[in-house]
């Protein structure tokens, strides 16, 4: 009980999520995907802020699924993923799970 109460008082970092770039694999779409009317609403440069490691309002659910564990870890003050992967150890570059048109997101701790 004491540990649970103590953990709830820890200050969590805010985490900024920035949409960096989308790639489209037209050859794969033509070969495998059924035509769809509506795809991703995310725009390059779009930003969200995660507070207390929670999904920001308006964030694509599929993108959040891909990055959630990294955002939660950064919010708790953890970082240095994969032992020196990123120049900024309190950040990560994550792509969404859309195999035809993945979006890359830069996630970083902010003050």
Question: Predicted segment positions?
Answer:
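A general secondary-structure signal for short beta-strands and their flanking turns/coil
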Residues: 10-14, 100-102
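A short beta-strand micro-motif
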Residues: 14-22
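Short N-terminal binding/cap micro-motifs at the start of the first secondary-structure element
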Residues: 24-29
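Short, flexible N-terminal segments of the mature chain
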Residues: 30-55
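Short, Lys/Arg- and Gly-enriched loop/turn segments at beta-strand edges
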Residues: 55-65
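Short, compact, well-ordered microdomains
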Residues: 67-111
């Amino acid at each position: 009980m004491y540990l649970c109460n103590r953990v709830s008082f820890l200050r969590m970092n805010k985490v900024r999520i920035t949409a960096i770039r989308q790639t489209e694999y037209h050859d794969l779409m033509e070969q495998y995907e059924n035509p769809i009317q509506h795809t991703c609403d995310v725009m390059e440069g779009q930003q969200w802020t995660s507070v207390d490691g929670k999904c920001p309002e308006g964030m694509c659910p599929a993108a959040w699924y891909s990055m959630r564990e990294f955002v939660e870890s950064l919010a708790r003050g953890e970082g240095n993923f994969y032992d020196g992967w990123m120049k900024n150890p309190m950040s990560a570059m994550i792509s969404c799970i859309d195999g035809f048109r993945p979006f890359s997101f830069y996630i970083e701790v902010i003050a």
